[in-house]
């Protein structure tokens, strides 16, 4: 089986993707530090907003919806509550460095949704066994 992943905040594209088996839609709300990390690189930074979560979820019958939040910060709990209220099926934690950060995020999520831990930092990779 193959899982397909599409980052979008476009309802029409979400509807088309929803017809495909194994599809996961992905709303990207990460903004904290992203511009600084990607300065000088030929990358695209999304302009997704929290309202996009509900707009995309409303288009889906089969596909699951994942939302990438900001790295752990004082507003994480409020961000999480907002996206879960709009129907996020899973949440992603980016840019964490330590197992303690991931555990803190897990405590905030408190079993309300599956967590996707994005292993994109050297600290995160070193902490895999923890």
Give each language-model segment a name.
Residues 2-8, 25-27, 63-69, 89-93, ...:
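Hydrophobic faces of well-ordered beta-strands that scaffold small-molecule active sites
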Residues 69-75, 83-90:
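Hydrophobic/aromatic-rich structural module bridging two neighboring secondary-structure elements via a short loop
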């Amino acid at each position: 089986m193959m899982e397909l992943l599409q980052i979008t905040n476009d309802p029409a594209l979400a509807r088309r993707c929803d017809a495909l088996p194994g599809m996961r839609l992905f709303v990207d709300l990460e903004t904290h530090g992203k511009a600084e990390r990607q300065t000088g690189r030929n990358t695209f930074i999304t302009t997704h907003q929290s309202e996009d979560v509900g707009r995309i979820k409303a288009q889906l019958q089969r596909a699951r919806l994942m939302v990438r939040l900001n790295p752990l910060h004082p507003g994480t709990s409020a961000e999480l509550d907002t996206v879960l209220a709009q129907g996020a099926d899973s949440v992603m934690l980016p840019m964490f460095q330590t197992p303690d950060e991931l555990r803190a995020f897990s405590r905030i999520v408190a079993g309300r949704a599956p967590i996707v831990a994005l292993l994109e930092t050297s600290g995160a990779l070193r902490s895999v066994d923890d």
